[in-house]
């Protein structure tokens, strides 16, 4: 079975002056994948709202203050049944307003992101992510976190295997 590859980036928040976490899976921004899955569901319900509206969790919380993507994070970012926040509502930044979550299962060889769920006060129905699952090699996952935690100008925007995601001017 082919494993997915993960990378993390750092973006300035659209809301305030802090940094947020960007997540790239197999070179694609996860936020774009999620928004595409949600778009059709929102339209089918006849809602005239913009889907998505996500912003990554605080880069500081994810990598420096806590170890969010290894399951050690603030209680505000963990929901019932061990659902970890990947994105929050970009217009408030308040956990639970419109948060995308998933379970993160970790063993010696693999990290699996599964059971994606939207915790939302905005959308009045449950979104379906169709069994979306990502499987990562534990070593590559750890290296991606290491690069994010030890971000320098040289590696801050570099994917764990050296693929350039983007750079600032």
What spans do the regions from the language model cover?
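Intrinsically disordered, low-complexity acidic regions enriched in Pro/Ser/Thr
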Residues: 1-169
């Amino acid at each position: 079975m082919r494993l997915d590859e993960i990378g993390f980036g750092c973006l300035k928040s659209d809301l305030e002056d802090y940094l947020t976490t960007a997540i790239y899976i197999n070179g694609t921004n996860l936020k774009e994948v999620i928004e595409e899955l949600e778009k059709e569901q929102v339209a089918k319900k006849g809602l005239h709202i913009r889907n998505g509206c996500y912003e990554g969790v605080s880069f500081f919380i994810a990598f420096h203050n806590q170890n969010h993507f290894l399951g050690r994070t603030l209680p505000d970012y963990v929901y019932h049944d061990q659902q970890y926040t990947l994105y929050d509502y970009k217009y408030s930044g308040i956990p639970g307003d419109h948060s995308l979550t998933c379970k993160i299962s970790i063993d010696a060889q693999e990290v699996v992101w599964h059971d994606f769920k939207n915790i939302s006060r905005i959308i009045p129905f449950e979104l379906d992510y169709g069994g979306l699952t990502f499987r990562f090699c534990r070593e590559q996952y750890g290296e991606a976190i290491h690069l994010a935690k030890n971000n320098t100008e040289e590696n801050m925007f570099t994917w764990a295997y050296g693929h350039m995601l983007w750079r600032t001017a």
